Amino acid sequence: MIERPSTDSGQATEVACLADPVPAHPLLDGLTEIGRGESSIVLASRDDKHVFKVVSSPADYFYLAADDRPTGIHFPHLFADHGIVGKASNGYSFRLLEIERLLPLAGEAAELGRMLVNAYWEGCEKWANMGVNRGRLALYHIAQDPPAGLPASLVKAVAALSDFIEEYPVQPDLLNPGNLMMRGDGTLVLSDPVFLP
């Protein structure tokens, strides 16, 4: 059974981080690492608006860079795909993406994030007998019957994410801390909501 993350205590569930070093690339020389996840490394760019994200998971690459990826106000903006920059220890290629800089959730975005995570968790519990497909069903049902108070733009984003997941060999992950972030203006962003099963 999956463990429900604490959304109120401020304590994040521990996430295994990619152990690989930052790959050598001229665009990354001298940049500061600001984040690391299960399959990615984030480095600050020379301005406050962009970051460089080195991804080793095809799921992350599809989500952030595919031509038919979901787009809109609740999805990260891709500025450039700089291609393959090495090979990760997991066997996949490292790809270098330049995306918008996002921030940890706070204020109203944090409240919307909690609402979305709670609805997703409830759906996962409801559809637990569906095994690995429970997350897909939970997402689909949020789009079809959203919780009260979820803005129409976020419902539309959840529907777009649900459609994307049906087309790619990925599963949704809204429970992992850091998969929901926000822009400086407070807009909730589905920053990294997919993984390879």
Positions of PLM-derived features:
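ATP-binding glycine-rich loop module of kinase domains
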Residues: 28-92
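Conserved structural core of kinase catalytic domains
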Residues: 76-154
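Acidic, glycine-rich flexible loop segments
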Residues: 152-165
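Catalytic activation segment of kinase domains across protein kinase-like and atypical kinase folds
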Residues: 164-197
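Conserved hydrophobic "DFG−1" position in protein kinase catalytic cores
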Residues: 44, 98-101, 182
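Juxta-kinase regulatory segment immediately upstream of eukaryotic protein kinase catalytic domains
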Residues: 1-31, 145-152
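Active-site ExK catalytic segment of metal-dependent nucleases
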Residues: 51-58, 100-102, 192-194
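Protein kinase-like catalytic core scaffold
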Residues: 50, 74-77, 95-97, 169, ...
